[in-house]
């Protein structure tokens, strides 16, 4: 919930929709120009709904490394994929250089997003800096988390309300400890 709510807050301030066409995020990729069967949910999550009874879905992943949100399967972008999904699954991928805030309450959408938040760190590339914001119920910043990777050293910092916060490294490799 924290990620979706923050994307809604961003949408309120910028006018850029939370659920957007692929070309809005990848304007320099000609393959995204006419994609109408998949979309970006915010700036980090790609969703390719299943529209066929048999569960076959064809989708395109733009350049980069993409990690399936639920299974953790890693795929390289810049190519098309054709797969079969059942009623309980669909292609939902998180792009590299993403910090994804996952809430700790599955019962309600009305809770303190920063309390016990899980920050999933997705493949931060060497030389990159990325961040995420966790909002409070009024849309103000409750927590900011930043990741910087230099010389294969990944540094994670947080500022704000970070009670019981935890980091989960997803598809993060070649990091010195």
Mark where each language-model region is.
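Catalytic core of carbohydrate-active enzymes
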Residues: 1-173
């Amino acid at each position: 919930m924290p990620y979706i709510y923050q994307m809604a807050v961003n949408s309120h301030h910028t006018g850029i929709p939370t659920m957007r066409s692929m070309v809005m995020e990848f304007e320099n990729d000609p393959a995204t120009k006419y994609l109408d069967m998949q979309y970006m949910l915010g700036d980090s999550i790609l969703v390719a709904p299943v529209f066929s009874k048999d569960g076959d879905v064809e989708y395109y992943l733009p350049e980069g490394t993409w990690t399936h949100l639920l299974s953790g399967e890693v795929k390289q972008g810049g190519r098309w994929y054709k797969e079969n999904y059942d009623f309980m699954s669909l292609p939902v991928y998180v792009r590299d250089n993403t910090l994804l805030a996952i809430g700790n309450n599955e019962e309600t959408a009305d809770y303190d997003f920063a309390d016990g938040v899980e920050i999933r760190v997705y493949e931060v590339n060497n030389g990159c800096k990325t961040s995420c914001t966790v909002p409070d119920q009024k849309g103000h910043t409750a927590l900011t988390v930043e990741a910087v990777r230099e010389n294969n050293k990944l540094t994670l910092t947080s500022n704000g309300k970070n009670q019981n916060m935890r980091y989960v490294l997803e598809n993060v490799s070649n990091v010195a400890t």
